[in-house]
Amino acid sequence: MAEANPKARVNLERAVTLLLDDNPEGISILVQIVTAFGIKSLHRCTSIEAAQEVAGQYELDLIVANANMRDSSGYDFVSWLRRVNLEPNSFTPAIILTGHTQVSNVRKARDCGANFIVAKPVSPSVLLERILWVARESRPFVACDTYVGPDRRYKDMGPPEGMEGRRREDKLAKAATPAPAAEESGEVPEAQAKAVQ
């Protein structure tokens, strides 16, 4: 993934942001990071109940939530927000922060409807990259019985326009790989033929 351009100008001054973390030091660090990005309108929440109240009262532009808290989790809040009828907040970009990035936690973040998961300790440049990515992406929102959130079919979409990343190369490599049926029949799919030329 391309790093955030230090010379790029992004105005986050009007972005209304909800920070959810029950750890006073954790929320203090988040406040310092996002205010350095220029964000001025912050709602600091130390519980899901407080975050739900804020989501019911204010129109939010960004949510940054700690995955694991004493009595609940950021996963629970994002899942609740996606399923409750609080437009436009139900569609607000949500980033989950976690110190444990096992596959099970990444799946949990994806399945709750989060846009991204970021590993702790949080690097300001990585968090800014994810915020910019979310601002540029145009993944459709999906709502069904088992999932509500941004379209999870990520790998085949590649990164947003203007950003380089591993996924674009993966997509090209996938196009150049023959499909199993084509290998057996000796036929070369049109997309593969174009990729090889």
List each language-model region with its residue ranges.
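Two-component/phosphorelay signaling modules centered on CheY-like receiver
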Residues: 24-48
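CheY-like receiver
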Residues: 10, 136-197
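Alpha4 helix (beta4-alpha4-beta5 surface) of REC/receiver domains from two-component response regulators
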Residues: 31-32, 76, 101-116, 142, ...
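C-terminal output helix
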Residues: 122-131, 135, 139, 143-144
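Active-site residues of response regulator receiver
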Residues: 66-68, 98
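Short amphipathic alpha-helix used as the core "switch/output" element in two-component signaling
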Residues: 68, 73-89
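A short, hydrophobic beta-strand element within the central beta-sheet of small alpha/beta folds
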Residues: 18, 88-101
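Acidic, metal-coordinating helix/loop segments flanking the phosphotransfer/catalytic sites
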Residues: 44-62, 66
